[in-house]
Amino acid sequence: MDILGATLRVYVDDLEKAIPFYEGLAGGRAMRSERGGVEVAAVGCFLLMSGPESQLEVLRKVAATIAVTDVEETLRAITSLGGDVIAGPVPTPAGRNLIARHPDGAIYEYVDRRA
């Protein structure tokens, strides 16, 4: 399993207002999507999220989003090391993801960029 990098999760009240700042900071354009009532904008290493508090409450439990080369390989590594998969793998607009709980209780999202 290769870890390619991590994305910082930023929860904002007003996505439209936040995007220009993060685009300027990261030097790139936001890639937008929506899932389960939560609006998402990926800008550089930032993942901006805005939506109903009931949905964000669940998302706030995820410490970070980690980019990997292959989600299936990551699933095998996590489970063989004593972690468990809470959700996924499932397709997303950017690739596939899964949510996993590490043996210490920390929860992370893992994503790959496969079509």
Name what the model sees in each region.
Residues 18-23, 78, 105:
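Conserved active-site tyrosine of GNAT-family acetyltransferases
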Residues 28-61, 107-113:
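Conserved short beta-strand elements that form part of the metal-binding/catalytic scaffold
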Residues 14, 70, 102:
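Acidic di-acidic motifs
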Residues 1, 79-115:
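Vicinal oxygen chelate
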Residues 1-19, 62-64, 114-115:
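N-terminal beta-strand motif that seeds the catalytic metal site of vicinal oxygen chelate
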Residues 24-31, 82-84:
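Conserved acetyl-CoA-binding loop of GNAT-fold acetyltransferases
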Residues 64-87:
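Mid-chain, well-packed structural core segment of small domains
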